[in-house]
A protein has these predicted regions:
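N-terminal binding-site loop/beta-alpha segment at the start of enzyme catalytic domains
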Residues: 1-76
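Conserved, mostly hydrophobic/aromatic
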Residues: 6, 18, 50, 65, ...
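Active-site mouth loops of central-metabolism enzymes
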Residues: 21-33, 90-104, 129-131
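Short, acidic/polar
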Residues: 29-42, 98-115, 160-169
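Alpha-helix-loop-beta-strand connector modules within alpha/beta enzyme cores
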Residues: 62-81, 138-148
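Active-site groove signature of glycoside hydrolases
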Residues: 111-130
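Beta/alpha (TIM)-barrel catalytic core signal, keyed to glycine-rich beta->alpha loops juxtaposed to Asp/Glu
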Residues: 127-323
């Protein structure tokens, strides 16, 4: 497993990370009872970067990591996130809460669940522009660095794609890393962020499972994360990707492998696919042994200009509902 630097922090992360949300959340169909087994297997297979948040499974994700990793704390890199208040829900859903009192409380609880006295990367979770530009919040995050509670601080953009301005502002403020969506259909704003020398964690490399043939046929579900996409968008993404799938098959590759390898070609620190079980973990790790040739890369780039760019634009526009 190759390691990459997380920007200028000196932290090295495995190029393939394990996202805990897909193990403990109904949104990705994970099995909580088997989550610890997947984490342990991931470590055995060389993954040392684990991406979680306090809200994943309402604390369960962090507990799973602590239970599974045990004494390996100094051998792994843990990213967790705060800012989505699941302790005080509205209409059954967490709310954004960036008051300093809440952040102190949330971070303390995260450390308790993780059974550690520090996190490697601490990120604000889906903040709005006002939170990102807040000097009070920024200073608070950097105080955590000075106190040794966080080795680095950043911003996780979401839940959707179109947070370019917020990402750029976070970089300008001095946050050391971003987490964002990127795949060969939804290439912006990720390729803009790629130009900056910061830590970059990529999620959803399979475009809400449209680029993972093992998850087809895809259906809309209010429980699943792909509810952020219309079923019509996903169907078009699957249809437009067929020439890539067919070419890949002739070369002994799966579409999900192509999607992962294409993303790994870029200057990102770590790519975190949606891993719901041991089978997903094994096939994603095994994909790292494959290679893309120029014919596949060229076809992807051609189809982006002729087909995917319109889907990318629609994804950017859907974010307006969350701003």
């Amino acid at each position: 497993m190759r390691l990459r630097y997380f920007g200028t922090t000196g932290i090295k992360v495995s190029e393939l990370g394990l996202g805990i949300w897909s193990l403990v959340s109904e949104e990705w169909g994970g099995d909580v009872d088997k989550a610890e087994e997947v984490v342990r297997k991931a470590y055995e297979m060389g993954i040392t970067f684990f991406d979680t948040a306090d809200v994943y499974g309402e604390g369960k994700g962090e507990e799973v990591l602590a239970n599974a990793l045990g004494t390996k704390r100094d051998k792994v890199v843990i990213l967790t996130k705060v800012g989505l208040d699941f302790y005080n829900k509205k209409h059954g859903r967490p709310t954004l809460n960036y008051s300093l009192d809440y952040l102190r409380f949330a971070i303390k609880r995260s450390l308790e669940r993780l059974r550690t006295d520090y996190v490697d990367i601490l990120m604000l979770h889906n903040p709005k522009m006002a939170h990102i530009t807040s000097k009070e919040i920024f200073d608070f995050m950097h105080e955590l660095k000075k106190d040794g509670i966080a080795r680095s601080v950043g911003v996780a953009l979401g839940p959707t794609l179109g947070w370019l301005d917020e990402g750029i502002k976070a970089i300008e403020m001095g946050y050391e890393g971003l987490e964002f969506i990127y795949n060969f259909i939804e290439r912006e704003p990720g390729e803009t962020f790629e130009k900056y020398n910061i830590g970059k964690v990529v999620r959803v490399p399979h475009a809400s499972d449209a680029l993972d043939e093992e998850k087809n046929p895809l259906e809309f579900s209010p429980k699943l994360h792909r509810r952020f996409k219309s079923l019509e968008w996903i169907r078009r993404a699957v249809e437009y990707s067929k020439p890539i799938k067919e070419l890949a098959e002739r070369k002994g590759l799966k579409l999900y492998e192509v999607a992962l390898l294409y993303t790994l070609r870029h200057d990102f620190s770590s790519v975190v696919p949606n891993t719901a079980n041991l089978h997903d973990l094994e096939r994603f790790v095994n994909a790292l042994n494959k290679e893309l040739d120029e014919e596949i890369i060229s076809l992807i780039d051609q189809l982006y200009e002729s087909k995917f760019k319109e889907l990318n634009q629609e994804s950017l526009e859907e974010t307006n509902a969350y701003k």
